[in-house]
Amino acid sequence: MNFNTILEEILIKRSQQKKKTSLLNYKERLCVLPKSVLSYYEGRAEKKYRKGVIDISKIKCVEIVKNDDGVIPCQNKFPFQVVHDANTLYIFAPSPQSRDRWVKKLKEEIKNNNNIMIKYHPKFWADGSYQCCRQTEKLAPGCEKYNLFESSIRKTLPPAPEIKKRRPPPPIPPEEENTEEIVVAMYDFQATEAHDLRLERGQEYIILEKNDLHWWRARDKYGSEGYIPSNYVTGKKSNNLDQYEWYCRNTNRSKAEQLLRTEDKEGGFMVRDSSQPGLYTVSLYTKFGGEGSSGFRHYHIKETATSPKKYYLAEKHAFGSIPEIIEYHKHNAAGLVTRLRYPVSTKGKNAPTTAGFSYDKWEINPSELTFMRELGSGLFGVVRLGKWRAQYKVAIKAIREGAMCEEDFIEEAKVMMKLTHPKLVQLYGVCTQQKPIYIVTEFMERGCLLNFLRQRQGHFSRDMLLSMCQDVCEGMEYLERNSFIHRDLAARNCLVNEAGVVKVSDFGMARYVLDDQYTSSSGAKFPVKWCPPEVFNYSRFSSKSDVWSFGVLMWEIFTEGRMPFEKNTNYEVVTMVTRGHRLHRPKLATKYLYEVMLRCWQERPEGRPSLEDLLRTIDELVECEETFGR
């Protein structure tokens, strides 16, 4: 075994059947787990040929497969699954001890991944469906809650030591296991419950436990301990940019320009992620452009080909780290239009939402809610602006009696609360102990995207519209990655906050509607104009039906809020779409943008791109005008 290898063993893998025509077979493979990948080889250790490799960062779930004494057609009878990208690898171990060892080690390796599934399928995919829930789509959302940290591994007794042999001494534990994890707070956080810990921006904290993806136990410099939101802190490492005020992680070119323009300060700047993974861009504002007018410049941070590599904005001034570049150009323009004078950031201004108001808190006491003005009404009832504990602004949906399948929703709400992303409207909790039930969510100041577009027609640039598409696609890609289907994506179900960020709302809620006019494809309220053929014909929802709806949403955005097929009835739309008719190209959309929409409207689901592919395409379009930097 190689020194860097964690595990190495001959196991049996089942073919992943990535294509419908692929045969189902079971093959013996040498499985090797180093630090960054899971590889499997044909042959033995002496002479082996790699047949496959899975990047550890792409793994979303590792778990034992529940088989209920079903027939396993190979000699190894102890299965576990590795879910990665859009595939599931089933592996069969020769003993329960072997299986437990692999599952435990793999879980340890993926514990810091940001794509861990919320629900998974505990049983095999076989004969065209999952044996646990009988869903027939391979990408169907999981049916059982998945908690990476609640291990299902059985504790097995160690083998009895041989009497005549002396037991070897235990291995010396590696030093790094005892090192403390120190993080830095990026935002202030006020403790709302006794078990919470207050965060002060810029202060350091020691992490004690990570038993929940969204809430970690920590200790401050005074010795106080409690739970903190994990998205409010970042690791204290010299190469971690999150700790710097000038770094804005989730900011595209259009939003960067908007922030810089709002600050309106000479030399205002920020560092943000480039559309090319692993690269960064410096966005810079000057009031005195080349011809005396204000303007923006976007400079790519380049890397040298030397070892160790260096970074630079101006080739003559290369440094060993990005913070060193920024520090240098704060004092020297050196080829830039102006010095980096004033860092512009969202840190400290707009703290991200948290998964609930506190750790393990999803039931909200209605006496803690203050009701204010009405915001609107929808399928489920009236929505009002309110406050929680007279401090935090929230939106409160009062569920009209008979409008929702309440028992099913309450159970699902616990899972939905753990869906947290900057481009999703956060569910904070529910009030279920009285009637009507209340759903408490993040408040979005500018209301629904559809009205936002219609009220400001003629005032949007193409960049601004594309940025809206990017926001929605980021939220939808997160749902896809977590095997969660929206089912009713449209401009009316997206909201806009004060900063102009668009977030996806009401994801998954369509499942709980009891109104036949909305749930039946023949009903007058059924959203036919946003649905692909497999939905209005067979009610087959999947992430690929969400892709179709996303294409229609793009059309809504680039028509500034027009109704799709506005002159046609639902019945006429079904006939037209079935015959291959598609929405026309909006005037504000380029030919290439319209081609992206048409890809979303392919008749067969497998012909449509994934939301991950769409996001990559849109990211490239957003950044395509960045031509500065030499």
UniProtKB/Swiss-Prot annotation:
Example GO molecular function: zinc ion binding
Location within or outside the cell: Cytoplasm; Cell membrane; Cytoplasm, Cytoskeleton
SH2 domain residues: 246-344
Domain PH: 4-111
Biological process according to GO: adaptive immune response; intracellular signal transduction
Pfam family, one: PK_Tyr_Ser-Thr
The protein's required cofactors: Zn(2+)
Annotated SH3 domain residues: 178-238
Free-text description of this protein's post-translational modifications in UniProt: Following B-cell or T-cell receptors engagement, translocates to the plasma membrane where it gets phosphorylated at Tyr-518. Undergoes also tyrosine phosphorylation during platelet activation.
Cofactor binding: number and manner: Binds 1 zinc ion per subunit.
Keyword Chloroplast: no
Chief location of this protein within or outside the cell: cytoplasm
Function, in words: Non-receptor tyrosine kinase that contributes to signaling from many receptors and participates as a signal transducer in multiple downstream pathways, including regulation of the actin cytoskeleton. Plays a redundant role to ITK in regulation of the adaptive immune response. Regulates the development, function and differentiation of conventional T-cells and nonconventional NKT-cells. Required for TCR-dependent IL2 gene induction. Phosphorylates DOK1, one CD28-specific substrate, and contributes to CD28-signaling.
UniProt note: domains: The PH domain mediates the binding to inositol polyphosphate and phosphoinositides, leading to its targeting to the plasma membrane. It is extended in the BTK kinase family by a region designated the TH (Tec homology) domain, which consists of about 80 residues preceding the SH3 domain.
Protein name as it appears in the record: Tyrosine-protein kinase Tec
Species for this entry: Mus musculus (Mouse)
Source lineage: Eukaryota, Metazoa, Chordata, Craniata, Vertebrata
